[in-house]
Amino acid sequence: MRVVLQPAYVLHSRPYRETSALVEVFTPEYGRVGLVAKGVKRQRTHRFSLLQPFCPLLLSWTGRGDLVTLTGAEAAGPIPVLTGEGLICAFYLNELLLRLLPRRDPLEALFSVYAHSLPSLIHAQQRQQILRLFERDLLAYLGYGLILKYEAGTSRPIEAGQWYSYQLEKGPVRLLSEDLEGMKVRGHTLQALARGALADPASLGEAKRLLRWLLAFHLGDKPLKSRGLLEELRRLGNVSRKEERP
């Protein structure tokens, strides 16, 4: 199979043999794809300089199976200037995609969400909301979408002033007892998450705890490296301790 000029972003790359690299990319029509980039490390070729995370690309490849051979790479736009926490947040998005996306599953809408999220991470005041909405959309496109408008198993709308216990694989259940399993969350937060408008710190905090809890169920026990990286940068004094990790 030959693919020509497919929009793509590099999620991760690692050396392969002496002069090549194995590159994981995210594309709209083919989802996550594994590429062999032959000879790209030889004298730091132009193609090697292009195959960097967060750079919008147009890639061409040939082959079948889990690994295909890269035949062409072109820049499709500028790389967003990400530093500090913004850069780590972008790596966090990449890590989620690497860990959760299956190979060769087309996800055009999620690709669009990712492409629009990256430049928004430049702005510190938007980062936490951008991350929460990306997590929400990622779960939805993978088939694990949150129930945010109605109580689980009913047609009763979520009430802003009510507390709920969000339960795995079920959804929000009206909180009548502190003994219920699940994640405690306000109806106001569920409504804000449904609208994509997490304006107040309390809703952002609750949404972060809820989504992290839900993602942990699918990620398993292996910790995310991006979270540890932010802690290390904080230890070295490169990131303010007031800045929240992903």
UniProtKB/Swiss-Prot annotation:
Where in the sequence is the signal peptide annotated?
Answer: none
Gene3D superfamilies recorded = Nucleic acid-binding proteins, Recombination protein O, C-terminal domain
**NCBIfam families recorded:** reco
What is the organism of origin for this protein?
Answer: Nitrosococcus oceani (strain ATCC 19707 / BCRC 17464 / JCM 30415 / NCIMB 11848 / C-107)
Entries under HAMAP family matching the protein:
RecO
GO cellular component terms?
A: bacterial nucleoid
Record's keyword annotation contains DNA repair: yes
**A Gene Ontology BP annotation from the UniProt entry:** DNA recombination
Its annotated function is as follows: Involved in DNA repair and RecF pathway recombination.
Q: Which InterPro entries match?
A: ARFGAP/RecO, DNA_rep/recomb_RecO_N, NA-bd_OB-fold, RecO, RecO_C
| This protein's encoding gene | recO
Q: Which family does it belong to?
A: Belongs to the RecO family.
Q: Which domain of life is it from?
A: Bacteria
Protein name in UniProt: DNA repair protein RecO
* Pfam families tied to this protein: RecO_C, RecO_N
Q: Show the taxonomic lineage.
A: Bacteria, Pseudomonadati, Pseudomonadota, Gammaproteobacteria, Chromatiales
